[in-house]
Every structure is written in C-alpha cells, then in structure tokens.
C-alpha cells in the first residue's frame, strides 16, 4: 500500500501565514529606512536598493529556512557550542525584544502622533499615556497566541498594506520631483552602502526568533511532519519577502522624489509624512500615523510573544518546549507582562536614546547571525566538518564584539582588523570568516585523520 504524502498547508493558509510573517517583520524601521536611503542615494537608488534588498529580505528569508532546517535558532547556534548557542540566542531575543526593538515600537509610533496633538499638551505626559495604552493592547493580544495569526494575517496586516499602497500610489501617480545627485556615502559604492543599511531593519535577527511562532501556527493548521513544516515556513517566508520587496521599492520611490524638496532630511518618518501631507494634506498626516501605529503594534505583539515563549521554555518551565500548554500559560503571561512593562518604561526615555544603542548592538550580533545562517543552509557539509562551526562562529563573534566595543566607547582607536579587506565599509568580519572557514576545514580533516 502506497504511503500518503505528508499533509501541507492549503494555499489560503500559506497566504495567511505569509502575511502574518510580513506583519511581524514589517515595523517602523522597515518604513523609515527605504525613503531616507532613496532620498540620500538619489539617482543611485536602484543600485543602493539592490544591496538593501539582499540584506533586508534575502538574509531574513534565508534565516527562516536555516532555522527550519535546524529545528530552532538555538539548535542552529549550538553547533558552535551549546553554551555559545544559549548565550547568542538569548542576546538576540533581548536585542529584538525588551532592550531595543519592543520599546522602539511605541516610541516611533508616538513620534508620528506628535504633529496631531493639540497645542500646549505636555509631551512627557502624552508619551506616558500613549505608551501605557500601547503596551496594554499589545500585552492583551499576546495572551491569545491563536489570535495573533488571525489578527495579523487577516486584519491589521492587510490594512497596513492597503494604507502603504495609498501613500506609495500617490507618489507614483503624482511625482513630487526628480531624483537628486547621490549624497555621501551613497556617492561611492551605493550597493555596498545599501547592504549595510539593510542591517538596521534587524529582520535577520527577527527571522531567527519568529520561527517559533510560525512553526506553532503551522502545527495548529494540521501540518505535523517536520520536513513539511520547514517547507511551509520557506513558502511563507517567500511570500513575506515578495510583499516586503514591493513595498520597499514603493517607499524608496516616494523618498527619491523629495531629494530636491528636503535634501537635508535625516529621518525617513519625516520624509513619509511630508510626502503624504503634500498629497493629502492633514488627512495624509493621519494616514501616516495609522500606518506607523499598525506596523509598530504588529511587530510589538510578535516580539513580546516570541521572547516570552523562548525564555519561558528555556529557563522557566520544566520540560521546555515539551511542556504542556497548561504548564506554560501562567509563566508565559508573567514573562509577557514583565517584558511589556519594562519596554513601556524604557520607551519613555525617547526614540533618540533608544536608537543610540542600536548600532553597536547590531554590529556585534549581525555578522554572527549571517555566518550561522549561511552555514545552516549548507549544514550537511558543515556538519561533516564540525570544526568549521567552531572556528567560524567563535572567531567572527570575537571579532564583531571587539569591533563594536571599540566603535561604541573608543571611536578612532586602531585595531588589527582595520587592516583587513572590507574593513573600510564595516565588513572586516567577512575575510575573518573566510580564513576561519579554511582553518576549520583543515582542523576537521586533521581530527578525522587522527581518529582513523
């Protein structure tokens, strides 16, 4: 008797999960980076966007696939060493969670509300009230994991897409101006600078974390075979990636048209707000606020949920991921409340302070995430040469942390890494990874030869 093929998702479920994934990834940073990139890149925008799309979409989609193949982000990173996996994944969750990304969602949404506030209103009081209300809603939705996909995939996700299409469509139909000449640093090496700018979305790190929620959702929809789950995650990731690519290009077009109107702009949010107000007046300002609110709320819900579940399964509940939902419910709710409350407090220090800490943290984590994902995609070869994991993961982590600490606290100090190729564009980790890979191969062969 022929065995039946593993059950997969229906097409409409794949689309729903893909849109939910898009909603989890597409936050404030995704909205504000492309317009600023295009305004500064000007006529070099096509080249800059190629690099940006590779980093902001290609790497996260590869991240989803690599995690699906490995099982979890921790299992992927633990190929370097179990302790390394534990520490690295915890750092990723803290970075994309309560220490940076979660408080940034509330702060960014509030910044877009400020132009709509009545004159004389205390910004400090308004920020506090908004943050409390924002995180109360996010916390309430987080406690209903089954609702997350339905809300993000069927309501707020499509609404967000529709509003962005409205703003971008206006820019396409009624251009505001021609592209300006490229500004530094896009006037030299636009594609490379676009790639580095793609770091700021943090979506590669998010892809390592959100796999937990997406995998659970796919299980709930009836897919139980592990290989099939990985395949469905890949399909959903492609859908999310295509949606993001289309919207990124549209947002870039809107920003590129304002290069001569506001050449000194330093904030993508201001660029979008200006574009919308020039097309729609006050209604445009309201639309932009709603766009930012939906994007930030979507991401906040996903981040609180995945961070709470990870730390709950890893450090709190006995049995970890194998524990029953009943055993998980109370600890999960407590952690979700703690993360939401902490993020609420941190968000009140203001967006500028939060963003000040983002660059060194991302520069320390991103190179490690990139090499882990790339090795995860060819895990069969790397698993056959296990020392490759140790050398590449360990050496790149050391190099990235040292460089990030130098950049944050000792700017201008010279390091030996500065003499390496690509160091001038912040990618000294790449040649370091190549050398470590070769050493890891040689080490693996030496160990295998010694045993034989």
What are these regions, as identified by a protein language model?
Residues 68-75, 134-156, 220-223, 341-356, ...:
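Membrane-water interface regions at transmembrane-helix termini and the short interhelical loops
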Residues 37, 107-126, 219-220, 300-337:
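Helix-loop-helix connectors at the membrane interface of multi-pass transporters/channels
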Residues 73-78, 247-297, 359-362:
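TM-loop-TM module centered on a large, flexible mid-protein loop between adjacent transmembrane helices
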Residues 10-21, 46, 83-96, 128-132, ...:
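Select transmembrane alpha-helical segments in multipass membrane proteins
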Residues 370-438, 449-452:
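C-terminal membrane-solvent junction of multi-pass transporters and transport-like membrane proteins
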Residues 16-26, 31, 170-177, 185-254, ...:
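Hydrophobic, membrane-embedded alpha-helices of multi-pass small-molecule transporters
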Residues 141-171, 358-370, 389-398:
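Membrane-interface loop-to-helix entry segments
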Residues 144-155, 191-194, 214-243, 260-273, ...:
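Hydrophobic, small-residue-rich membrane helices and short re-entrant helix-turn-helix hairpins
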